[in-house]
């Protein structure tokens, strides 16, 4: 019997992704990575952040992790959201309270509720229509809509995102059970 290890799990997940691609699934990866709330702009965040790790250490949701190369090799250890692990809690501003450099400005809960860190994107071919993303969204930015499958002569429900309401918290991406490829992913804003 072979014990499960992270390497074996990664190999198995890679094989599942290849099989899903063969069945017509589409990979969905962020076009831009998501930085924490409270920054004035991405360029100011990258310039001011020293990668000290206070926001990562104090995040109660554990959604933040140090970047490796997501923001380029000149910006190692800058905090990046990891929606595979968790999501940014709607009523939490802890990361903005502990930043010593001003890369993240303190936010009130009310300001956090409207601070946009990203936008969710749906890949309808991967969506299983379960509705978990819609039920988890704190801003009610996701609904399920019928989508016709003309080749099969039927319609099915798929997630639809209202980006005027989405703030990019990642709750939808975190909860999405579609495997081996998520049906929804959050792209960071500049």
Q: What function would you assign to each model-found segment?
A:
Residues 1-190:
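Non-ligating segments of multi-cofactor redox enzymes
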């Amino acid at each position: 019997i072979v014990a499960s290890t992270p390497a074996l799990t990664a190999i198995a997940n890679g094989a599942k992704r290849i099989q899903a691609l063969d069945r017509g699934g589409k990979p969905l990866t962020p076009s831009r990575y998501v930085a924490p709330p409270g920054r004035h702009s991405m360029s100011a965040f990258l310039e001011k952040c020293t990668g000290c790790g206070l926001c990562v250490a104090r995040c109660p949701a554990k959604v933040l992790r140090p970047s490796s190369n997501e923001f380029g090799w000149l910006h190692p250890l800058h905090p990046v959201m990891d929606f595979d692990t968790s999501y940014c809690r709607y009523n939490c501003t802890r990361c903005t309270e502990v930043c010593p450099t001003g890369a993240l400005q303190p936010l009130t809960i009310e300001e956090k509720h409207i601070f946009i860190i990203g936008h969710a994107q749906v890949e309808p071919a991967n969506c299983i229509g379960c509705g978990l993303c819609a039920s988890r969204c704190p801003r009610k930015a996701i609904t399920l809509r019928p989508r016709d499958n003309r080749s099969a002569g039927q319609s099915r429900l798929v997630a639809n995102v209202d980006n005027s309401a989405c703030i990019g918290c990642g709750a939808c991406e975190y909860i999405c059970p579609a495997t081996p490829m998520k049906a929804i992913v959050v792209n960071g804003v500049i």
